[in-house]
A protein has these predicted regions:
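Exposed, low-structure sequence patches enriched in small/polar residues
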Residues: 1, 5-356
Length: 356
């Protein structure tokens, strides 16, 4: 493999994009029932990477694309938005991005039920640094295929009960990702040798199912905010996700006098154990673990914080003790393998708004 002889890694990047658009606004006349836009864009991306002789390799990528948008945002019952853009010349020739969403608001049992459908189809060029990277520790030049990402998502939202249910299905073909492997000594999990990071592309499609429930409850001064997420990946060695992720925030919110309000509460974050993405200090990027049976699982450990907020007009004082349950259970307080979270930390501060 090629090696960089510089004493440090560096890269430069700048981008210039120009877009010319013509649009008719929704409602500007009695015939304009929706907004309509057509546009053409020119994109110039410049990159610099070190070469093997101490010099610099320069890359320029040009791209021309055309697209259009149809949208309706006025009114109470029905709204929609659709955007399409296709690459017609340059590095992104043959790319396609189609995004759309539609929502219907229906009166339901004294509440308003919002039914929202959204989705997209993206055929995109992998990022430059997945295709080209030169450094002292890692070096690659890849010829990667276009990434094809499809998503279909549906959302149900109740305004009064503050309930929202969201379900999404993703399929990603030719998914590009970073993979990290190293040698681990049996007596020291933190000692790594032979570290290798590679940019890879999945040969088969990856399917991802996501279901989320958002529920806020308020009863007098008692408030309870919850987010529960379920996910399933068809290829956990490419896109690892926890099966269950929970966030819950329980607090009391009450006034003391007219201009003084106090919040007292605690929140908790929890996710089931899984082979979480590793971290590469040499790249400052997260990577998929690729160490076989020596992959490390994290999770199955709650993180609990307690806090108090004092609001006086436009000023807020707060105190917080994070990770108050440090040392409990199996002490597996990691979000990333080999990088433990902080123990209990006391924080305090003040913030204010500069408006009347």
């Amino acid at each position: 493999r090629q090696m960089c002889i510089r004493d440090s890694d560096n890269t430069k990047h700048w981008e210039m994009k120009n877009t010319l658009a013509l649009a008719t606004l929704e409602g500007f006349s009695k015939w304009a029932k929706a907004g309509l836009k057509a546009f053409v864009s020119y994109d110039l991306r410049h990159f610099e990477l070190p070469d093997t002789e101490g010099g610099v390799m320069k890359y320029n990528e040009h791209s021309v694309s055309v697209g259009g948008q149809l949208s309706k945002r006025q009114g109470k019952l029905l709204h929609y938005n659709a955007v399409a853009e296709i690459g017609v010349a340059g590095e992104d020739a043959g790319t396609l991005a189609v995004d759309g969403d539609v929502d219907v608001n229906i009166p339901f049992l004294g509440d308003t039920l919002s039914v929202i459908g959204s989705g997209f189809f993206h055929r995109i060029t992998p990022s430059f640094y997945f295709r080209n990277y030169h450094g002292r520790h890692f070096w690659w030049e890849n010829d990667l295929d276009k990434i094809i990402h499809t998503r279909i998502m549906g959302t149900l939202k109740f305004a009064k009960t503050k309930t929202m249910l969201r379900v999404a299905v993703d399929e990603i073909k030719n998914y590009a990702y970073l993979s990290q492997s190293y040698n681990v000594t049996d007596n020291n999990q933190a000692a790594h040798t032979g570290v290798t990071v590679q940019a890879k592309q999945s040969g088969s499609p990856v399917n991802l199912l996501t279901a989320q429930l958002f529920q806020d409850v308020r009863w007098g001064i008692l408030n309870w905010e919850n987010v529960i997420t379920y996910q399933h990946s068809s290829k956990t060695d490419v896109i690892p996700v926890p099966a269950l992720n929970v966030y819950s925030n329980l607090y009391l919110k009450f006034p003391v006098v007219k201009v003084l309000n106090i919040d007292l509460g605690a929140d908790v974050r929890y996710f089931t154990s899984y082979e979480a993405p590793d971290y590469s200090p040499a790249l400052s990027q997260y990577t998929v673990q690729d160490n076989g049976d020596k992959n490390v699982k994290v999770g199955n450990y709650p993180i609990v914080n307690v806090y108090a907020n004092v609001h006086i007009k436009h000023t807020r004082f707060f105190v917080m003790m994070t990770h108050v349950n440090k040392g409990s259970g199996d002490k597996n307080y990691f979000f990333v393998p080999h990088y433990p979270l902080n123990g209990s930390v006391f924080r305090f501060g003040v913030s204010w708004n500069f408006f009347n």
